[in-house]
């Protein structure tokens, strides 16, 4: 299932992680579970496409259509 209206932010980092957020269209956001963080299988089923290693790490209650992802930086890039 592919959705053209999924928006992917630029990636940004801190000392330990690389981050990005993904904004879903309203009709797709209705399928986001409210009780738990999604597994990779769940967010891929929604049509989110990104490389391996990304983890859905936080639910932002006021804007549940925005998915927050992170993945560890390689050791040589950690500050």
UniProtKB/Swiss-Prot annotation:
Any GO BP annotation: regulation of mitotic cell cycle
- What function does this protein fulfil? Binds to the catalytic subunit of the cyclin dependent kinases and is essential for their biological function.
**Span of the signal peptide:** none
Q: Which Pfam families match?
A: CKS
Q: Which InterPro entries match?
A: Cyclin-dep_kinase_reg-sub (IPR000789), Cyclin-dep_kinase_reg-sub_sf (IPR036858)
Q: Which organism is it from?
A: Xenopus laevis (African clawed frog)
Its encoding gene is what?
cks2
Lineage: superkingdom: Eukaryota
> Which Gene Ontology CC terms are recorded?
cyclin-dependent protein kinase holoenzyme complex; SCF ubiquitin ligase complex
Q: Which residues cross the membrane?
A: none
Q: Name one GO molecular function term.
A: cyclin-dependent protein serine/threonine kinase activator activity
Family statement: Belongs to the CKS family.
- Asked if the keyword Signal belongs to this entry, the reply reads no
Which keywords does this chain's UniProt record carry? Cell cycle, Cell division
Complex formation? Forms a homohexamer that can probably bind six kinase subunits.
Protein known as: Cyclin-dependent kinases regulatory subunit 2
